[in-house]
Structures are given as structure tokens and as C-alpha cells.
Regions:
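Metal-cofactor-dependent catalytic cores
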Residues: 1-259
Length: 259
């Protein structure tokens, strides 16, 4: 088995950046979900409800993040200067401090999404640790999927889907479907990762990231429910992980299952 994809999502719930190599810090991949879009009530906006976020692109250029909208793009610093923080709602009533970014970008985002919104950066990040924290992650720092499990799912679907439906940070190429259910700990290159729990999948998997349309029969969730039910309810695909031993990773690295 080997690592075949590495993805980071600088702006939560938007298009990923695929990289050939990176560094796994104790809190995940560099620059992963350091930014988030919020609405007029300072609440998190995600592509579950606002699929057009999936067509917001970004790329790292030197010391800046370029945010690319369909009609224009903006440069914002990777290490923003501190300003007056706002309290934003992440999950439920959980409040987190965040820094507003660029009024012109906010206006363009609002126009694109059709409602008032802002891009914010996690104020909990210090400049020295900016690349180390997935501050707006849903659950654990890392999400891993495997190619064999996707192939098995596609074998059950009338229409095949891509791995991008599952928004993984790490994709492992392997031959046996769902074998990752038994993993407790793995090594990728010099890094060691610990499995915390399976990833429960949500309605976002039913949205085509290219056309932004939702599947009329709720696929792949409906098919996953026939054979990937979790004990706690819901359906699972992929694993949530934490970093036990930090270090560099690269596409092609061997993936080893540890006791």
C-alpha cells in the first residue's frame, strides 16, 4: 500500500489544494482549514448548505493565500496581522475567536454566494504555529480513505463517483476493500498515525463537486447504508486519525499497518 493523494483545505468547505509532499504536525497538515466563511450571524457556512463554496479555489503563493472566485481573485497573507476578533459559531453553539480578513474579498464572496458573508481566520493561531493547526476542522485533524473501498462502493452504484466526494486529506492506494476497518495505527513514511474512529458521512457526499447538483436518490449515502452502517447510527466511509509521530510525507510513501 502507498500514499497516492495529499489534500489540504485552507478555507473550510471549499475546493482542496492537492500537494505532492507536506508535513504532518501533531495537529494535521499545514494550512488545513485555518480560514472559514461565516454568515451575517457569525455562524459557520459549509458546502452542505451552500454548494457554491465548492467552486471557491485557493492556492499558496509565497507568503500569501490566493483566493480564487469565478470572476476575480484576491491575495491575503498566510499570517494575518492581528485585528479586532469576532466570536464565530463553529459547531452548534461552540464559539471561537476569529479575525476578519479583507472587506473587498468579503463583498465579492457575498455577491457570489448571494448573501452577506465574511472570510475569517482563526484567532487562536499564533504566527509561530500558523501552519500547524487545523483550527476549523469538523472532528479530528486528518481524514483518510482508500482506493479499494471506493472501487467497492462504485461497484454497487449505478454511476461511479470520484474520491473528491469524500474530501480526504490522505488517500491510500490498496487492493482490499474496507480493510481499514481493522486498522488501529499506521505508519506513513516516518510518521505514525492513530485511528480514532470511523468517519460518519453526511449529505455533502451526495453533491457533485463539479455540477453542484445533489443526487436525486441520495447516493452514495443510500448505497453505503446497505453495507457500511455504524454502530452509533449513520454510515461510514474512511477514518479519522490523529498524528502520533510528526514528520514529512510524500506521495508514493509506503503505508504500513502497525499492531
Amino acid at each position: 500500500m502507498y500514499l497516492s493523494e495529499i489534500n489540504t483545505y485552507p478555507i473550510k468547505s471549499t475546493h482542496p489544494i492537492s500537494i505532492k509532499a507536506g508535513y504532518l504536525f501533531p495537529t494535521g497538515i499545514g494550512f488545513d482549514r485555518n480560514w472559514m466563511v461565516i454568515d451575517a450571524n457569525n455562524a459557520m457556512m459549509t458546502s452542505r448548505k451552500y454548494p457554491k463554496l465548492l467552486h471557491v479555489f485557493s492556492c499558496i503563493e509565497g507568503s500569501n493565500l490566493r483566493v480564487i472566485l469565478p470572476q476575480q481573485d484576491f491575495l491575503i497573507p498566510l499570517v494575518p496581522l492581528p485585528n479586532t476578533p469576532v466570536l464565530v459559531k463553529h459547531w452548534g453553539e461552540e464559539l471561537m475567536p476569529a479575525w476578519p480578513q479583507n472587506p473587498a474579498l468579503d463583498a465579492a464572496l457575498s455577491d457570489y454566494l448571494g448573501l452577506p458573508c465574511r472570510l475569517v481566520y482563526s484567532a487562536s493561531l499564533q504566527a509561530s504555529e500558523v501552519i500547524q493547526t487545523a483550527s476549523f476542522a469538523d472532528a479530528q485533524p486528518l481524514l483518510l480513505t482508500t482506493t479499494a473501498s471506493l472501487a467497492a462502493l462504485n461497484g454497487r452504484l449505478n454511476e461511479a463517483i470520484g474520491m473528491d466526494r469524500f474530501r480526504a486529506n490522505l488517500v491510500v492506494s490498496n487492493l482490499i476493500a474496507d480493510i481499514e476497518d481493522d486498522w488501529k495505527r499506521i505508519r506513513i513514511g516516518a510518521c505514525e498515525l492513530e485511528v480514532t474512529y470511523p468517519c460518519e458521512r453526511c449529505v455533502l457526499t451526495t453533491i457533485n463537486p463539479v455540477s453542484l447538483t445533489k443526487h436525486e436518490h441520495q447516493e452514495p449515502l443510500r448505497t453505503l447504508a446497505t453495507y457500511r452502517r455504524l454502530e452509533e447510527g449513520g454510515v461510514g466511509f474512511g477514518l479519522n486519525l490523529i498524528v502520533v509521530r510528526a514528520g514529512p510525507i510524500a506521495i508514493g510513501d509506503t503505508v504500513e499497518v502497525l499492531p
